[in-house]
Amino acid sequence: MRFIEEFINKGYFHQCTDLDRLTAITKETKIAAYIGFDCTATSLHIGSLMQIMILRLLQQHGHKPIVIIGGGTSKIGDPTWKDEVRKIVSKEDIAKNAEGIKKSLSKFIKFGDGKSDAIMLDNAEWLDSFNYLDFLRDFGSYFSVNRMLTMDSVKLRLEREQHLSFLEFNYMLLQAYDFYYLSKHYNCSLQLGGSDQWGNIVMGADLIRKISGKEVFGMTTPLLTTSSGAKMGKTAAGAVWLNEDLLSPYDYYQYWRNCEDADIVRFAKLYSEFTQEELNRFESLAAEDINAAKKQLAYELTKLCHSEQAAKSALETAVKIFEEGQIDENLPTVVLEKEVLQAGISAYELFHEAGLVTSKSEARKLIRGNGAKINDRLVEDENMIINTNFLLDKKVIKLSAGKKRHILVRV
């Protein structure tokens, strides 16, 4: 199966500047294509997983993936579909975040010097040295303010009479220049991104056409939500991170294991590398086979992101907890100073300290709703004092929020 054919078959396609021509070119030759990522956290989360799988697909078909870290544009902020001004990231945080993002990506694609090896660039390398007057002189006349004002990302803010700073307005110009720079210096002929980036991508392609006459393309992916409308990458407990220092492989496994029934087939197509025969089997699942399919999906996605050993460990932990009722040492763990337990801590505060809830009020609500357990026993009093008497084997306390979220507190 060819790259574009598989791209469409997996559900990645939303829009392209010239799909027929791009299909023909990618059949005849290998291209370089790029995707940009925000440099605002030390890890990517599953909201970026489709873009990562596209980079992986590019590489598998012999094309060269280029990853752009927005070290330059992160200093400004992208207004695209945001209701509020973006927080500006410091240089120190950008460097730290870039390292973590490469760690996320390296789980899925190979970086190196080979023809199809991925490269990662920070657009600060060329944007930081910009002379503003030179930029206006050389590129300003190619951009139409009239057109920029019609873009949904800008129009939405203007219609709501929300603040849109000059800094953010310039983001579009800088992203367009990124594409031009990569076309000129890396022979990049395709920019990929979410459908909310369409206007920025087209501006870049137009800039290249006007200046150099090169044939380049833009292609976007659909914006994804779960079948219930929830945003991909976010849960009540926080983001579903790809790096294990922010989210354990077990919790990653559990996210996919607990996906909604209606999402199984779509997630299998988007995020896994199941064969067509296996995908066909997913599409014709009987009701009694759904849980087994979820386990298979969770196992494969955890193996892809972490390792086969991590997937096996996560599966074994889940079996012990949910099917055998045991406490497993591989559960996510937090450490609490022994002095805290010796003095005693209220149940709701302990759930908050352990990170199972994001606030003390949420902890109270969890307990009042009969959703909290300590050592598998229901917590009925939010002010109940938890002390060293609750330690199992004198070393751990098991906390549970609902049926599917568990954590061990160690001292």
From Swiss-Prot:
Looking at the keywords, is Acetylation present? no
Where in this protein would one find the motif 'HIGH' region, according to its record? 39-48
S4 RNA-binding domain ranges (all copies): 345-411
Enumerate the PROSITE patterns for this protein.
S4
Gene Ontology process terms (BP): tyrosyl-tRNA aminoacylation
User: For the motif 'KMSKS' region, what are the positions?
Assistant: 231-235
Which top EC class is given? ligase
A Pfam family reported for this protein in Swiss-Prot or TrEMBL: SYY_C-terminal
According to its UniProt record, which protein family does this protein belong to? Answer: Belongs to the class-I aminoacyl-tRNA synthetase family. TyrS type 1 subfamily.
Protein name as it appears in the record: Tyrosine--tRNA ligase
- Its gene is tyrS
